[in-house]
């Protein structure tokens, strides 16, 4: 389900403060965030966020194509190690 238009995009308040401070200072450090549910806004383009995936902060460099998506989409939480092989002995 899509969020209703009249509500606007959800962004954590602390995330906005961190992004504004990074823009004002002009430094390009990784901004650590835990809010995977926050929407990426146009003012975040060009910044690098460290999105927490449960183990570590995955660096996500925001570009124009990411606007409107959620931060969690770019920081996978599960690792796929492949399906197990055939346990039966193969006959030739």
Swiss-Prot record:
Entry-linked PROSITE patterns: RIBOSOMAL_S19
InterPro entries reported for this sequence: Ribosomal_uS19 (IPR002222), Ribosomal_uS19_bac-type (IPR005732), Ribosomal_uS19_CS (IPR020934), Ribosomal_uS19_SF (IPR023575)
Domain of life: Bacteria
Keywords attached to this entry: Ribonucleoprotein, Ribosomal protein, RNA-binding, rRNA-binding
Transmembrane annotation, as ranges: none
Cleaved signal peptide residues: none
An example Gene Ontology molecular-function term: structural constituent of ribosome
UniProt xrefs under Gene3D superfamilies: 30s Ribosomal Protein S19, Chain A
Gene Ontology biological-process annotations: ribosomal small subunit assembly; translation
GO cellular component, one term: small ribosomal subunit
UniProt cross-references to HAMAP family, sorted A to Z: Ribosomal_uS19 (MF_00531)
Function, as annotated: Protein S19 forms a complex with S13 that binds strongly to the 16S ribosomal RNA.
PANTHER family registered for this protein in UniProt: RIBOSOMAL PROTEIN S19P FAMILY MEMBER (PTHR11880), SMALL RIBOSOMAL SUBUNIT PROTEIN US19M (PTHR11880:SF8)
Family statement: Belongs to the universal ribosomal protein uS19 family.
Protein name: Small ribosomal subunit protein uS19
Species in which this protein is naturally found: Nitrobacter winogradskyi (strain ATCC 25391 / DSM 10237 / CIP 104748 / NCIMB 11846 / Nb-255)
């Amino acid at each position: 389900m899509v969020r209703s238009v009249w509500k606007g995009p959800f962004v954590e308040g602390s995330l906005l403060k961190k992004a504004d401070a990074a823009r004002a200072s002009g430094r390009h450090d990784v901004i650590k965030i835990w809010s995977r549910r926050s929407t990426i806004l146009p003012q975040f383009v060009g910044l690098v966020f460290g999105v927490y995936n449960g183990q570590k902060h995955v660096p996500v460099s925001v570009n124009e194509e990411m606007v409107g998506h959620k931060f969690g989409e770019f920081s996978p939480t599960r690792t796929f190690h492949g399906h197990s092989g055939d346990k039966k002995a193969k006959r030739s």
